[in-house]
Regions:
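Conserved beta-loop-beta connector loops within the AMP-binding
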Residues: 34-56, 93-94, 156-160, 195
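Acidic/polar alpha-helix N-cap and adjacent early helical turns
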Residues: 201-208
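Short coil/loop residues immediately preceding or within conserved phosphate-binding loops
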Residues: 30, 80, 129
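Gly/Ser/Thr-rich phosphate-binding loop
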Residues: 1-22, 27-34, 44-45, 59
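AMP-binding/adenylate-forming catalytic core of the ANL superfamily
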Residues: 4, 57, 61-65, 69-76, ...
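General small-molecule cofactor/ligand-binding pocket signal
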Residues: 180-183
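Short coil/turn motifs at beta-sheet boundaries
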Residues: 26, 46-48, 141-143
Length: 208
């Protein structure tokens, strides 16, 4: 498996054997890839902080006729030009990187930041789940509530309480979905991307 984008190809990679343990969005950094904090510091292995995945070297000049987006993605930090597409991650003591997700999709629930991809990958480890999408639903108390749209494996049923408990076994309680919606498909495109806007609308229509 590889981590990258059109703005930053070959950022990181992982290898999984048939007998290997399944892990959620974990990679080894490529030689030109670092995890940088918002103020430009390099994140050190074992740090409790999170940062943005950044690639240096042969990176694109920018986006066609979009200087604002180009300036945001392609940044010069301490004299080095970096491509920073917006993926947030943490890094273990052994250097393993755990991808959290895109900052643009981050859900703020009760003042805590939750990255949808992190919860989605964990949900997909449950034996009843084929695929999952996580969005922010309205919540009077927390502002946004973690809402999961889940596609079941053939012959399996989606049980909301089971999936919520499953996530709480792996993560802090605030990252667990408040609601779980069973769907026929999450509509993941061939490139692996999800239409979060459309999925949010589905969640709102279902819950209201």
């Amino acid at each position: 498996d590889a981590l990258g984008s059109s703005e930053a190809i070959g950022m990181a990679q992982s290898t999984t054997s048939a007998a290997g343990e399944s892990k959620t969005a974990s990679f080894e950094l490529g030689p030109n890839t670092k995890i940088l904090t918002e103020d430009g510091r390099e994140l050190q292995p074992g740090s409790s902080e999170i940062g943005r995945v950044a690639l240096k070297g042969n990176t694109p000049i920018g986006y066609y006729k979009d200087p604002e987006k180009s300036a945001k993605t392609f940044q010069i930090i301490n004299g080095v030009r970096w491509s920073i597409p917006g993926d947030w991650a943490s890094i273990d003591v052994d250097g393993t990187v755990h991808l959290l997700g895109r900052g643009s999709q981050c859900i703020n629930t009760g003042g805590e930041k939750v990255y949808p991809e992190e919860v989605e990958e964990a949900l997909k480890l449950h034996p009843s789940v084929a695929d999952a999408a996580v969005v922010g639903g309205p919540d009077e108390r927390f502002g946004q509530a973690i809402t999961a749209l889940v596609e079941a494996l053939p012959g399996q049923n989606i049980v909301e309480a089971d999936l919520i408990a499953f996530i709480k076994q792996h993560y802090a309680a605030y990252k667990a979905p408040k609601r779980v919606i069973a769907v026929a498909t999450v509509g993941r495109a061939s490139n692996g991307k999800l239409d979060y806007k459309a999925l949010t609308e589905i969640a709102l229509a279902t819950l209201t």
